[in-house]
């Protein structure tokens, strides 16, 4: 996601200074508390947050203090919860669960998981059970901040980006280009099926009805994992809602049983 020129220049200038510090602190294997301090420096110097107005480490959720939280411009409502791990710890999916639970309890939509080297941005999914989607990730030590496009990696977690709704737009783009949405469009959009039917007639001069096309797409073309599960169901419902019709019902054909080889006499 392109960053505005002024913000891009700020990110590049700050990270040219901060990157060697991050690398040095990783070599020293600093503690989690010191990693929190380093992260606050990155967020204030490079990402546009006010260290004193926007960032707090004294926010209690059900009696437990989160590592860091973001309140934009000293507002009372938390906008982002930040889960910090010591710089020497490799980030793992299990690390995000506690932060997502914290966020869900407070109605907070965004969570950042970081060890100062790697940064991951998640969107909380308020469902039963609570879930999360990873929206963006980057490694500060793998980027070359002499190149302008490196700023684009950090921009989505900048204060300016959140205020402009950039992470939400990235999530929308992610959903729009997912295999679930593309599969749902192929199967449930009359316009798409009509276009395929029309082109088939033009190419091979044969009329094929749309239900037959949908059946072929589902059973022979589209991978099964793009058609099953909550993401697939949600995508199909969205296509159905936008097209104003009921979902197309297509029966899945069982996989053909393999025939054992005939033994030779």
Model-identified regions with their sequence ranges:
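A short, conserved, highly charged catalytic patch centered on acidic carboxylates
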Residues: 2-110, 121-265
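Short beta-alpha junction loops
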Residues: 116-118
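Acidic beta-strand-to-loop metal/phosphate-binding motif
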Residues: 112-114
């Amino acid at each position: 996601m392109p960053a505005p020129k002024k913000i891009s220049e700020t990110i590049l200038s700050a990270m040219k200074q901060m990157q060697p510090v991050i690398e040095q602190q990783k070599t020293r294997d600093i503690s989690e508390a010191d990693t929190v301090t380093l992260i606050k420096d990155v967020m204030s110097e490079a990402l546009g947050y006010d260290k004193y107005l926007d960032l707090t480490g004294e926010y209690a959720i059900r009696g437990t203090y989160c590592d860091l939280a973001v309140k934009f411009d000293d507002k009372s409502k938390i906008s982002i919860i930040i889960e910090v791990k010591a710089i020497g710890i490799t980030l793992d999916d299990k690390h995000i669960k506690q932060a997502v639970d914290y966020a869900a309890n407070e109605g907070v939509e965004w969570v950042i998981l970081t060890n100062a080297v790697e940064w991951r941005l998640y969107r909380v999914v308020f469902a039963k059970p609570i879930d999360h989607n990873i929206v963006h990730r980057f490694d500060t030590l793998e980027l070359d901040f002499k190149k302008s496009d490196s700023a684009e990696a950090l921009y989505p977690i900048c204060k300016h980006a959140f205020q402009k709704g950039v992470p939400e737009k990235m999530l929308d783009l992610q959903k729009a280009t997912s295999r679930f949405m593309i599969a749902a469009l192929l199967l449930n959009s009359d316009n798409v099926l009509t276009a395929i039917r029309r082109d088939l007639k033009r190419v091979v001069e044969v009329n094929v009805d749309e239900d037959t096309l949908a059946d072929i797409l589902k059973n022979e073309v589209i991978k099964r994992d793009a058609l099953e599960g909550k993401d697939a169901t949600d995508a199909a419902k969205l296509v159905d809602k936008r097209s104003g019709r009921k979902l197309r019902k297509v029966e899945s054909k069982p996989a053909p049983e393999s025939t054992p080889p005939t033994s030779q006499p």
